[in-house]
Design a protein with these regions (language model features):
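Helix-loop-beta segment of a Rossmann-like dinucleotide-binding subdomain
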Residues: 81, 86-90, 187-198, 250-259, ...
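Hydrophobic, well-ordered beta-alpha structural blocks that scaffold small-molecule cofactor pockets
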Residues: 56-126, 131-141
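Rossmann-fold dinucleotide-binding core
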Residues: 154-238, 242
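N-terminal chloroplast transit peptides
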Residues: 1-55
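Structural alpha-beta junctions
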Residues: 58-61, 108-113, 147-151, 168-175, ...
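Active-site-proximal catalytic alpha-helix in oxidoreductases
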Residues: 208, 213, 229-274
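Rossmann-like NAD(P)(H) cofactor-binding subdomain of soluble oxidoreductases
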Residues: 100-107, 117-192
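NAD(P)-dependent Rossmann-like dehydrogenase/reductase catalytic/cofactor-binding core
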Residues: 52, 56-67, 72-90, 264-348
């Protein structure tokens, strides 16, 4: 009976290692699976203690095979990472702050960094990754050589579509769900318990190049077509608008406080903004929006809250309200409007 149990454990060990190899081939990090493999191997060896040598050898042999397979996977994973690094497309990076510096470090010294006051070169090919504040985006676009504007890549929070449309651009956009704590620190991926595969996404001409760059640093990034991009783009906008506004109603609140202490307020606001976004952009969110946004909040629970960059964030929904009222219709976002007035973001 004990021998059968030990055999089953050893077999599980080998199966897990094999699955890890399959995960690696699919582009999924096998780290968690490998750790489980080693755990099961240890258990198999413990269960084998006290058995005859031949029995023990057989059990440990299976575990040794699994460990060898796990080692092969680890080696393969390193090789895949190196191959990705070799294939990274050199870029022009505008801005040398936390995000810009982190992205430049992923480029292996092949990127060209444009700092404040410098001009974007016309003769450098590849993506132009803009890592600046939103309020200078218009001037950056205008100062970019006209033949290079289609190569612009934007990583900012907020709704950029109106600006890009006004400039006649269909540029690459990235929904950044990784965080850089301070200048020079490596980025931390914003994976959640509901989305362990990661949430960062890119769409546009250089989306695949951006994904390769991020994945070389161990970060996730989905490549989406423009239609697929709309829903996660708006979900992230709703996240930052709702969490920041509810937090502003409760001074000193962190994102985690909003999620854990004021969830009812948050849920009502998220549902209101989601309905407005669906109507405005002719989309339908997948069920569970509130749960997904709260899951992300838990991964960045220490972030402070404040209503800022109004034009790019809450301004998107406030403009929807203003247009409706101008047409003699009711405000589709009455709670949002009332709370903006309450915190002083707009005039009463």
């Amino acid at each position: 009976m004990a021998m059968a149990a030990s055999s089953a454990v050893a077999a599980s060990c080998f199966t897990l290692a094999s699955n890890a190899i399959c995960s690696s081939n699919l582009g999924t990090s096998p780290g968690l699976v490998l750790r489980k493999s080693v755990f099961y191997c240890a258990n198999a060896e413990l269960k084998c203690r006290g058995r005859k040598a031949s029995q023990f050898t057989r059990r440990v042999g299976s575990c040794s095979t699994a460990r060898a397979s796990a080692a092969d996977v680890k080696t393969s994973e390193v090789a895949v990472g190196q191959a990705t690094m070799d294939e990274i497309v050199p870029a022009v990076i505008v801005g040398a702050g936390r995000v810009g510096t982190a992205l430049e470090k992923m480029g292996g010294g092949k990127d060209f960094v444009v700092r404040r006051g410098e001009t974007i070169p016309a003769d450098k090919p590849g993506p132009i990754i803009v890592c600046t504040r939103n309020d200078v985006l218009s001037s950056i676009i205008d100062s970019t050589p006209s033949n290079r504007r289609e190569d612009l890549v934007f990583v900012q929070n907020g709704m950029l579509d109106p600006l890009l449309e006004s400039k006649g651009l269909t540029a690459t956009q990235v929904l950044v769900y990784f965080a850089v704590a301070k200048l020079g620190d490596p980025p931390t991926d914003g994976i959640t318990d509901l989305n362990p595969e990661g949430l960062t996404a890119a769409s546009g001409k250089w989306a695949s190049a951006i994904a390769a760059r991020l994945k070389s640093a161990g970060l996730s990034c989905k490549v989406l077509d423009p239609e697929e991009f709309k829903k996660p783009q708006l979900e992230k906008l709703i996240w930052i608008c709702a969490f920041m506004l509810v937090g502003a109603r409760h001074p000193g609140s962190t994102v985690g406080d909003v999620e854990s202490k004021h969830r009812d307020e948050l849920a009502s606001l998220v549902e209101e903004l989601a309905a407005a976004a669906e109507s405005e952009k002719n989309i339908k969110f997948d069920s569970g929006v509130v749960d997904r946004l709260c899951a992300y909040a838990r991964s960045v629970s220490h972030f402070p809250t404040a209503v800022k960059e109004f034009e790019w964030r809450n301004g998107f929904f406030y403009n929807i309200s203003q247009r409706a009222l101008a047409d003699g219709l009711s405000d589709p976002c009455p709670t949002h409007t009332a709370w903006l007035k309450e915190v002083g973001a707009i005039k009463s």
